Design a protein with these regions (language model features):
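Flexible, acidic/Gly-rich N-terminal and inter-domain linker regions that tether
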Residues: 1-42, 54
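Short secondary-structure boundary segments
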Residues: 4-10, 15, 74-77, 99, ...
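Short linear Ser/Thr-Pro motifs
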Residues: 6-9, 47-48, 133
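A structure-centric signal for secondary-structure junctions around beta-strands
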Residues: 13, 25, 40-41, 53, ...
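Generic beta-structure capping elements
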Residues: 21, 31-33, 47-49, 135, ...
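Canonical Radical SAM [4Fe-4S] cluster-binding loop centered on the CxxxCxxC motif
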Residues: 32-76, 80
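Conserved AdoMet/S-adenosylmethionine-binding subsite of the radical SAM
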Residues: 83-258
Length: 258
């Protein structure tokens, strides 16, 4: 794997632009969560697509789409990041999170399922916790149904994080923000009821909240059981696409870090 660029601060996060075996460029990231040292929590973010076809209003990855990495190309990102810190493949971190959330919509690449099945046997990592972040596109049942089985077989007892990006409870604004066909709140809630079992982490409903994008708790309560779902509100990153679309974060980045 060829590294084309590295940006960031090792004390917080490093972003790598790398070239895969097929000649495509992707981003992958390693990060920590101060004040926790990496021995406590180490987080990797890997790309599941070359760009992204979704076109969310705030996401720079939607500017182009050139296909899907194979299982080996996804693993090459993880192997690269792991090899820099733990070349023997033994990862002693209390929490070793791998987020399939850098570039691309993971549910549109079935190779991600193969990666999830193999992960527990590829590294010696007792703290392993994969994390899938999705917009829940329509027609992705052939990903989500086997994902439920893989979670039960390989990651039961709170070793898996499932996150759905909603961004607002206003349906019309959600359709503008995420301009593709996707599951309704009712469909997401129904899947969550099947996905969650006692001992699991709660399913995260993520809101990268922009000004003017409402979050109505009563709407959420109509579809999502608070015993099985939680709400996460994060700052909207100041991307090129966000600026083009005049999106301003509702949450101040500096206050969110404190």
């Amino acid at each position: 794997m060829k590294v084309h660029a590295t940006v960031g601060n090792e004390a917080i996060a490093l972003v790598y632009i790398v070239e895969t075996s097929s000649g495509h460029l992707v981003e992958c990231v390693e990060s920590v969560q101060p004040p926790l040292p990496s021995e406590k929590k180490w987080v990797l973010l890997v790309s599941t697509m070359f760009g992204c076809p979704i076109g969310c209003l705030m996401c720079d990855a939607g500017g182009y789409y050139h296909g899907k990495p194979t299982k080996d190309e996804i693993f090459s990102q993880i192997d690269f990041l792991v090899g820099k810190r733990f070349p023997d493949g033994e990862i002693p971190c209390e929490q070793f999170k791998i987020q399939f959330a850098r570039m691309g919509e993971p549910s549109l690449n079935l190779q991600v399922l193969d990666v999830l099945q193999e992960l527990p046997r590829r590294y010696r990592a007792p703290g392993l916790m994969p994390s899938i972040s999705t917009i829940a596109p329509a027609g992705a049942e052939r990903f989500f149904d086997p994902l439920l089985e893989i979670k039960q077989e390989e990651y039961a007892g709170g070793h898996f994080q499932f996150q759905v990006s909603l961004h607002t409870t206003d349906i019309a604004l959600r359709d503008q923000f995420i301009p593709v066909k996707k599951w309704s709140f009712a469909q997401i809630g129904d899947y969550g009821e099947r996905f969650y079992t006692p001992g699991d982490r709660k399913i995260t409903l993520n809101f990268a909240l922009a000004q003017g994008m409402p979050v109505d708790p009563m709407v959420l309560l109509n579809f999502f059981d608070p015993d099985k779902f939680l709400i996460k509100i994060t700052p909207l990153n100041p991307t090129y696409r966000a600026r083009e679309n005049n999106l301003v974060s509702y949450v101040n980045h500096l206050s969110a870090e404190q």
